Swiss-Prot record:
Domain of life of the organism encoding this protein: Archaea
Swiss-Prot/TrEMBL keywords: Ribonucleoprotein, Ribosomal protein
Gene name of the record: rps17e
UniProt organism field: Methanocaldococcus jannaschii (strain ATCC 43067 / DSM 2661 / JAL-1 / JCM 10045 / NBRC 100440) (Methanococcus jannaschii)
Source lineage: Archaea, Methanobacteriati, Methanobacteriota, Methanomada group, Methanococci
Entry-linked Pfam families: Ribosomal_S17e (PF00833)
Protein's name in the database: Small ribosomal subunit protein eS17
């Protein structure tokens, strides 16, 4: 079974995808760099978790 992500991660990721969908890709490293530019995220761990969820969602949307 997979891991369950917190609501904060899901909500933030979905808002960012709606705003900046054309900037995100299916590559985790690229999404991490985009997040650094686009959003004000306090910790590296939170940034990585949001980037991972965005990557997951972008793969589903293709």
């Amino acid at each position: 079974m997979g891991r369950i992500r917190q609501t904060l991660i899901k909500r933030t990721a979905m808002e960012l995808i709606k705003k900046y969908r054309d900037l995100f890709t299916t590559d985790f490293e690229t999404n991490k760099r985009v997040l650094e530019e686009v959003a004000q995220i306090s910790t590296k761990r939170l940034r990585n978790r949001i980037a991972g969820y965005i990557t997951h969602k972008m793969r589903q949307l293709q």
